[in-house]
Regions:
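Mid-to-C-terminal Rossmann-like scaffold of FAD/NAD(P)H-dependent oxidoreductases
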Residues: 1-85
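Alpha-helix boundary/capping residues
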Residues: 21, 50, 95-98, 110-113
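Flexible domain-boundary/linker segments
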Residues: 30-31, 91, 108
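Short amphipathic alpha-helical patches
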Residues: 37-45, 97, 114-119
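Short, charged/polar low-complexity linear motifs in solvent-exposed/disordered segments
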Residues: 62, 94-97, 120-121
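A general structural signal for short secondary-structure boundary/capping elements
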Residues: 82, 90-93, 112-117
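A short, polar/charged loop-to-alpha-helix boundary motif
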Residues: 85-104
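Cysteine/selenocysteine-centered motifs that mediate thiol-based redox chemistry or coordinate metal-sulfur cofactors
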Residues: 100-122
């Protein structure tokens, strides 16, 4: 079990518990996500990025604007972004919608993450 401490996670859990108390139980399925600003840097994480067996970097680390896509068992498990808010937003849509991108697609700057994130699941 992972311990997640963020405002969003607390709010999502509160809604789930309130629904249970009101007699409308449902499983907790919210996608964990987090952000923090550290000086000039914005760090954003979507999904659970622990236990990965492969990572793919999109963007240039040297530029200070990049995302690391984390894969577990060939499936996208999460993304860690630094100063790439669009990657974070698209990854949240991908992960919460059960959509996948291959490591090759994630690494390819010409691949349209937005289109993949908004496409209907197969």
């Amino acid at each position: 079990m992972a311990r997640l401490e963020s405002v969003q996670n607390a709010a999502d859990h509160a809604r789930c518990v309130a629904d249970r108390i009101a007699g409308k139980p449902h499983p907790y399925t919210a996608l964990p996500w987090f952000w923090s600003e550290q000086g000039e840097q914005r760090l954003q994480i979507a999904g659970l990025t622990n236990g990965f067996d492969r990572t793919v970097t999109r963007g240039a680390v040297e530029s200070g604007e990049f995302s690391v896509f984390c894969y577990r068992g060939g499936q996208l498990a999460g993304i860690e972004s630094v100063n790439r808010p669009a990657d974070h937003a698209h990854a949240r849509r991908l992960l919460s919608g059960g959509r996948q991108v291959t490591p090759e697609q994630a690494a390819d700057e010409s691949f349209d993450l937005r289109a993949a994130a908004t496409a209907r699941p197969a």
